[in-house]
Amino acid sequence: MAKINFYAEGVSLPRIRRRIVGKWIAEVCSRYGKAVGEISYLFCDDEYILKANQEFLDHDYYTDIITFDSCEADTVNGDLLISLDTVRSNARALDLRYEDELHRVIIHGILHLCGLKDKSKKDEAQMRAAEEEALVMLQETIGSELSLLHT
């Protein structure tokens, strides 16, 4: 049974429209022949994600998302840590709305759980294309002026 959880550590939990985000994630997973199992998002600050990156991945840098894959066969399961600090700073640097960048990061982790990679230039280009396709799906679902966040 599909279950998507949202938690926060050191930040306020974004006001996610849970039903819509759940439907969107399920649609994206379905495109890759996957079903949603249990997915947990932990929204955090830069310091929290840096410590997790150091402890679990032996990386000494900040990042917007860390994805821990617990997938089984064709069922998507995993834990995703998202630094809202980095999402916010990336949105400013890219001249994007915060909400749009958050949507991209939310689905980026799901795409990793569906098997996409982003370590090589070719893989990164495929990931970006998949993110864009997923964001179009989102816009078709909720309308171009709406957001996954409650305002």
UniProtKB/Swiss-Prot annotation:
Cofactor(s) the protein needs: Zn(2+)
Gene3D superfamilies according to UniProt: Metalloproteases ('zincins'), catalytic domain
Enzyme Commission number: 3.1.-.-
Taxonomy, superkingdom: Bacteria
Keyword Flavoprotein in annotation: no
Pfam family, one: YbeY
Binding residues annotated for Zn(2+), in chain numbering: H108, H112, D118
GO terms assigned for molecular function: metalloendopeptidase activity; RNA endonuclease activity; zinc ion binding
Biological process according to GO: rRNA processing
Subcellular compartments: Cytoplasm
Keywords: Cytoplasm, Endonuclease, Hydrolase, Metal-binding, Nuclease, Ribosome biogenesis, rRNA processing, Zinc
Entry GO terms, CC: cytoplasm
KW Signal (keyword) present: no
Major localisation: cytoplasm
First-tier enzyme category under EC: hydrolase
Cofactor note: Binds 1 zinc ion.
Similarity remark: Belongs to the endoribonuclease YbeY family.
Free-text function comment from the UniProt entry: Single strand-specific metallo-endoribonuclease involved in late-stage 70S ribosome quality control and in maturation of the 3' terminus of the 16S rRNA.
Stored PANTHER family: ENDORIBONUCLEASE YBEY, CHLOROPLASTIC
Protein's UniProt name: Endoribonuclease YbeY
Organism the protein comes from: Porphyromonas gingivalis (strain ATCC 33277 / DSM 20709 / CIP 103683 / JCM 12257 / NCTC 11834 / 2561)
